[in-house]
């Protein structure tokens, strides 16, 4: 397949000889347009970019200072949109020779054939994978699936083939450093961008010592983005609870002259809960999960979830109290049980709303 219409984007900071090996491999495997970004490298490393620029197929973009991998990628995307009108897409590659050129070509060809954004994913079960990388990927993928609702085998892969139609969006999202790649995945979800995964070789050179990834700072930036969905869901729930309680008090005070006893409580509780539920539904649909589900259908599913959840709260609380023989007069233990049940149902509600009520219909093909 002709790859002249695919640009390779290659961000690099303080490279060594491996950068030239990467470029030679890409050229040997049919790529004819490489956008190399010097992200503020030190003067003693600039000769690698000069050597690379001697190839007519290589265009070098320079950052005067280190701006981060995300900024380098976005700068290249913007350059391609303005200067490569015939490019059908790009494939991003790391400059440390961890992406084999055959895998890069496979991802680019798959993107051209399907029109889908394509991720080159590593197999972290291989024995030569550093333990830190293996455990880190497992944790990140699990957290990503739980709190974002996307099943991705390798959330930090730098090998990504991206159709031109997605470049304008992806060049405008936030994040200038390693967190940008996580923001890209989140943008794929919220904008319903279909994606596929292609298995690639898992290569670690010298325990990945050449990586500029800062373990604590960059990990915090990434996890902060992943947990943002859950944080917004928590805020939405708290605001709805405040509205629920406030409306109950207002209605109770306003209607006590015409209603009394059970009728007053029932009208106040049901009305307050209904209005606060509608508010919670709207916030979750528009601001938390950014769902494109039809409003009526999503609302029906929301209440289908809410009603059983109410009974589950009662049955679980009562069941635990009975099973463990908690005395009815022991208000502290009963309160602890109720709080634990509420926390359990809160996580369950988040998961069900994310994966069913407001489910984003990203389509991912089977791994090849």
Residue ranges, per PLM feature:
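A conserved acidic beta->alpha catalytic loop
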Residues: 38-47, 65, 97-98
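Acceptor/aglycone-binding surface of glycosyltransferases and processive sugar-polymer synthases
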Residues: 65, 71-79, 101-178, 206-213, ...
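Short beta-strand-to-loop acidic/aromatic patch adjacent to the donor-nucleotide binding site
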Residues: 84-98
């Amino acid at each position: 397949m002709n790859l002249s219409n695919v640009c390779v984007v290659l961000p690099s900071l303080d490279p060594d000889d491996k950068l030239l090996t990467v470029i030679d491999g890409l050229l040997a495997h049919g790529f004819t347009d490489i956008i190399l970004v010097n992200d503020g490298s030190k003067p003693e490393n600039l000769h690698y970019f000069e050597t690379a620029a001697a190839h007519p197929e290589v265009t070098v973009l320079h950052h005067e200072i280190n701006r981060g991998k995300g900024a380098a990628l976005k700068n290249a995307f913007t350059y391609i949109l303005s200067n490569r009108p015939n490019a059908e897409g790009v494939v991003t590659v790391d400059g440390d020779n961890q992406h084999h050129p055959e895998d890069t070509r496979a991802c680019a060809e798959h993107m051209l054939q399907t029109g889908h954004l394509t991720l080159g994913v590593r197999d972290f079960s291989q024995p030569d994978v550093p333990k830190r990388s293996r455990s880190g990927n497992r944790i990140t993928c699990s957290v990503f699936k739980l709190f974002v609702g996307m099943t991705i085998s390798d959330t930090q892969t730098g090998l990504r083939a991206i159709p031109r139609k997605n470049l304008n969006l992806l060049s405008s999202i936030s994040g200038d450093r390693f967190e940008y790649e996580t923001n890209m995945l989140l943008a794929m979800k919220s904008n319903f961008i279909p994606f596929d995964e292609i298995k690639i070789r898992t290569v670690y050179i010298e325990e990945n010592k050449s990586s500029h990834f800062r373990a604590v700072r960059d990990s915090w930036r990434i996890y902060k983005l992943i947990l943002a969905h859950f944080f917004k869901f928590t805020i939405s729930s708290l605001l709805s609870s405040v509205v629920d309680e406030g409306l109950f008090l207002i209605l109770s005070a306003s209607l006590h002259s015409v209603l009394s006893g059970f009728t007053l409580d029932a009208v106040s509780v049901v009305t307050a809960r209904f209005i606060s539920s509608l508010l919670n539904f709207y916030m979750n649909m528009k601001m938390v999960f950014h769902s494109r589900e039809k409003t009526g259908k999503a609302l029906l599913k929301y209440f289908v979830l809410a009603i059983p959840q109410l009974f589950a709260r009662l049955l679980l609380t009562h069941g635990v109290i009975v099973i463990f023989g908690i005395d009815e007069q022991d208000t502290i233990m009963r309160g602890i049980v109720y709080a634990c049940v509420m926390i359990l149902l809160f996580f369950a509600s988040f998961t069900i709303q994310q994966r069913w009520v407001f489910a984003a219909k990203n389509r991912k093909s089977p791994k090849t």
